[in-house]
Amino acid sequence: MSITNTIYSSKMLCWLYCKVSQLRYLGFKQEVERRSRLDLFDYKGIAKPLPKCYFEINTDNNCFGIGWSLRQYAGVKKSYCNALVEHGYFFGTYVQEVEKKTFTKNLLTFGDVRKAHIEAVVKDKDVYPIGPYIHYAPDYYDEERFAEEKKRLGRTLLVFFSHSGTGESVSFDLDALIERINSIRKDFQTVVISLFWSDINPEIEKRLKAEGYLIFSSGHRYDYYFLSRQKTMIKLADMTMSNSTGTHLAYCSYLNKPHWIVRQEIKTKALNKAGEGNMAISEMMSKDVVNQQENEELYQAFAEYEESLTNEQKRVCDKYFGLSYIRTKEEIFSLIK
């Protein structure tokens, strides 16, 4: 067993690992809280790098504020969830090593499809679908500030660009995507582009601003207000759009926002060993026939520009993302206490 898997399998070692990271970065929480007071569109301040500082002893739960959001929702007082939550939607039969090795008994995911894939591999855990995680995140803005922002933006198109993984860069035909965005731009007062924190660079900023687009980022992957910002931004939008499938589709559909996927070839490049590892996993997943079938079903469902979600789109999203599996505060409490 590798050192990493040894840590995953021991609650005490996971706890110690977290404590060491907290001692190394004593100002982490203060910095995250400071960023939580920034304007939603202050993407440069929100998307600055953060160190790898863990408070959730199940490491996946530190990503995007998933563990923090569940604890806020359920009123759990301790500093971690006693369950492992898949940090995003994985298409196909792939199951992370941490899910197989974790010390915890409960695994949480989106819907029945993922539940079945996990249970086919992990025999000694209980798997519970809880629907789109964004439901459990608190809003970034209160009602008054939200109303002010919506008035300022007017009718809004929100576009999610396909993003890189850890240690990777991502590229696609930006000119072609902008052409498709502009083909429906007349229907909106504001166009907002959502960029992952590590994909922001002067070249892309200049190009998007030249088109008159606003730039938004949900923040760093370890910023526990990530989902809160994303939730508020999606709620501010009237239409959503992307150039690939992904977890954003679960969140947009759950928040009842129409979505259009402009399918593009997405190219990734490894920047370091972490990137090489992630690309190897992505390549393995892409060869999975089930992965291909699941992605294709979603691409087909969202291939056309529609001004509202169709019944077929809702059905497909419920199938994969568990829209009907939203849990009460009491239910979440019992799963993560």
Put a short name on every predicted segment.
Residues 102-107, 190-191, 236-239:
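Short active-site oxyanion
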Residues 102-106, 113, 118, 319-337:
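C-terminal non-catalytic accessory extensions
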Residues 3, 7-8, 12-129, 138:
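Active-site and donor-binding regions of nucleotide-sugar-utilizing enzymes
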